[in-house]
């Protein structure tokens, strides 16, 4: 079964208040089996637009990624992030097919 991912790009207006979100999101993320593959860190943006912070979060399945986003628990936590940041987030299914040789 293919995994699911959140790909997130964020500009943070208030880093101190944003910390409350990063602390609070741990519980719903753990509940749905989330694992951070990328959490901030250095990046290069050779094409298109970007934001100042990036994250890639892996879930055991696409459905788990969707369910986490729509859960009442995460939606409550999201209220901490929205006033202090601007984000782009997509939920995407991973690829399990053949790879180039």
Residue positions per predicted region:
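C-terminal structural segments of small proteins and small subunits
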Residues: 66, 73-91
